[in-house]
Amino acid sequence: MAKAFLFHNPRCSKSRQALNLLEKEKENFEVFMYLDEKLEKDFLKEIIQKLGMSPRELLRTGESAYKENNLKDSNISEEEIINLMIEYPKLIERPIYVKGSKAIVGRPPENVLKII
């Protein structure tokens, strides 16, 4: 994986905006199509750690998989949440820009510029 990459969903307007901002800045990065490529558990844990967030904070609560898996339940462990994120990657908030030891959620998209 490149030193810098964007977790990207081309159907998401915020993700497309973040991609455009990074390209405009001539940032050297790779696009990671996280909905199409298999996420490895250790890799996802590393990204969550770089974000300085808990897995729960990174959940998209409006997704059907959130409701279907009762993720509102505060008794669900972080490990279980990570496993569900791997199984249902739409649960992961996006876009996420990772550069070296830093990562940031691109909400708003301009956030990605904070770590370039």
Residue ranges of model-derived segments:
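Thiol/selenol-based redox catalytic cores and closely related redox-interacting motifs
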Residues: 36-115
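Short glycine-rich hinge loops at helix-strand junctions in the catalytic core
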Residues: 26
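Local sequence-structure signature of Cys/Sec-based thiol-disulfide redox active-site neighborhoods
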Residues: 1-21, 29-32
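Alpha-helix C-terminal capping segments
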Residues: 22, 115-116
